[in-house]
Amino acid sequence: MDLAFSTEENIAAIASAVAPGQGAIAIVKVSGASAKEVVKNVVRTPSNKIWSSHKILYGHVIDKSTKKNIDEVLILIMDGPRSFTGEDVVEIHCHGGLIVVQQVLDAILKQPKTRRAFPGEFSQRAVLNGRLDITQAEAINDLIHARSQKAAQLAIAGIDGDITNKINYLREKLLDQLSEIEARIDFEEDLPKLNSKKLLTDLMLIRAELKQLINDAKQGSLIRNGLKVALVGLPNVGKSSILNLLSKHERAIVTDLPGTTRDLLESEIILEGVPITLIDTAGIRETNNEIEKIGVSLSQKTLFTADIVVLIFDLSKGWNKNDQNLLEKIPKGTPTLIIGNKADLKSQSTNIQPHATMTAITGEGEKELIQELLKLAGANELEGIEVALNQRQLDLVKVAVNALDQIEKVAAESLAWDFWTIDLREAIYKLGELTGEEVTEALLDRIFSRFCIGK
């Protein structure tokens, strides 16, 4: 899909979440050079008030073919450039529910030079018209999809321009260093010699700040994307009870019968600002039951996709060879917690030291389990993070750091200044691409195609 720079037509979309038959208010948004004329053609207002910017009008959306009212609406007008997109924008606030909202949108789309917006096209136009930079637009998308308060706070920081300001600050420093080097290349005899050691030290300080952004991005990803945590163990060790305990509601059926859970059950929780998807797996064992076999197979596959595995065993039976076999099936390198459950029934000695013990049916040990889980996830390092790069931004910063690494090698080999400028330009270009200083059509396509329609 090639949507970059396609701004000649008006675009329209439903700009609010709509569920069938639900919702008090919905919004249909129109943006473009003739957005006001488009909306005027489909509404009727009781007065002849001028359609002036940042005013709200009352009226009805009309079905032109029947002359009947489609809905009673409020109309919000925002003239460009004082609008989200920088173009004329009109919002029609109508009643919620799927049918009436779609009728309003259909009436708009029947107008000349008006089409349905592509995903992210409103935000794209805001960037093209200088209302936002790319990092701010991406932060808006992050805010819409935020799964915790911490994720929302990081997104707001991005919208406020914190990422752009930080990157621009470092990029300007690199530009200053590049200008010093190029001045010496062009006017070597007229300017004092550069101190290569001091210059390299300054560049390495910039590299250190970029590396800190990389480290913060890893933690930011934890806040933004969360973790997938698999609860695994032999049948009837209490996996479902632990899922219900952490979820604070009955998500899974709990019985004394082994093999009750035969499918993967998921529940999302927020712990210390980290979104965690808990996956209750079927007890892994040899079985002749075909349905249970499918559940066991799914459980084994989950071991390879989970960010963290919580291996639960029954303290009343102790750690046995089947528990050990299951532990050995967990892929090497996957962070794993070993939790002993049914501490109230403990009667067997165990030759393994669990990270925590608990009694899921009473809630005893829940706090310790959560602490161990957060420690393993690295959540204790989340405090103090002010900005967090997304994957696109992170990849570009990594390239910039690699370019500065090359400069360090160039300096060690005492190569000419021209060699310094090659990698310095690369770092500057990549940081410019991050903020949109260096923008391409393909870049815009890639970024905004991930947005929701109507934003």
UniProtKB/Swiss-Prot annotation:
The keyword Cell cycle does not apply. (6S)-5-formyl-5,6,7,8-tetrahydrofolate binds at K29, E91, R131, K455. GO terms for biological process: tRNA methylation; tRNA wobble uridine modification. K(+) binds at N236, T255, L257, T260. The keyword Metal-binding applies. Binds 1 potassium ion per subunit. Exhibits a very high intrinsic GTPase hydrolysis rate. Involved in the addition of a carboxymethylaminomethyl (cmnm) group at the wobble position (U34) of certain tRNAs, forming tRNA-cmnm(5)s(2)U34. Homodimer. Heterotetramer of two MnmE and two MnmG subunits. Its cofactor is K(+). Its EC number is 3.6.-.-. One of its GO terms (molecular function) is GTP binding. It comes from the Bacteria. Keywords: Cytoplasm, GTP-binding, Hydrolase, Magnesium, Metal-binding, Nucleotide-binding, Potassium, tRNA processing. GO terms for cellular component: cytosol. GTP binds at residues 236-241, 255-261, 280-283, 341-344. Belongs to the TRAFAC class TrmE-Era-EngA-EngB-Septin-like GTPase superfamily. TrmE GTPase family. This is tRNA modification GTPase MnmE. Mg(2+) binds at S240, T261.
